[in-house]
Amino acid sequence: MERCSGITLDEYHRRHPKPSPPCLSPEQLIEPAISYMYGFLLADGHLRDGSGQKGSLCISIAARDRYILEQFQSLVPCYSSIREATRSTNFVVDYESVAWQVSNLGFRNLLKLWGMPSGRKKSIVQAPMMPFSTVDFYRGFIDGDGSVGFTGAGLPFVSLVIVSDALLDGYLAFLKNITGKERSVMRSKRDNVYNVMVMREDACLLVNALYYKGCLALPRKMDMADAIRKWCRPIDMKIKPKGRPWTDADNAYVLEHSLSESMIKLGRTFNAVNIRRHKLRRMMNDGGVV
């Protein structure tokens, strides 16, 4: 091999790699399929940085969902690989998985521009700060890390476990826009996560918005969404009356008095007062307006 300045040409190119052009443009995040893919990757993918310009985006899911990774591969016009593997876990023997890996620096930089952190990210993820397709983004996140189905009692639900406060705020605002209802959710004491559960008619409204005809989605979750769309409330199932809205005076009283005093004065349950106080304090800590 011919040498130049004491090193081989191969070594020179390794030390001075050509910059990788972006596979996609930042503005393409507004496209439904791209927003969906980004939401899915944010929920279940892992962005790793190595030395220099090395690194990769990797996402591993059950082999039965290989279809969705093939769709992602077709959306990203740069080299990537899809590989299958079989391993035993604490829960399943001979678990079959499929992984999609992209090393292209331009694509990895684009994911960072959109807001995807490297390494552990569950507690800091949030919706993109630039224009994106909201419905498709949250469908991607739910397909990647949520559940869609029926309870043992036959009630439809859409469930999503969230760690990040920023992502929770965005998702609750999205749910309010779809269902017309404001939700207050507290972290579970055991796992320190938010479990956002949408059920019954609200679940029907949500899947109608999320899983629209022709959208990119996991086929099995699209099938479940179709089943939820057909659900009707049993005649003998009572409809829970709407809760009383919180006024500015109520909010001020809760912040200035004890839980028991607030329960008696406002005529509300312990859980209602406790959740409201937690939400108000978090809004104040984040610089929000109460």
Task: List the model feature ranges, each with a label.
Residues 1-290:
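Internal intein/HINT superfamily modules and their associated LAGLIDADG
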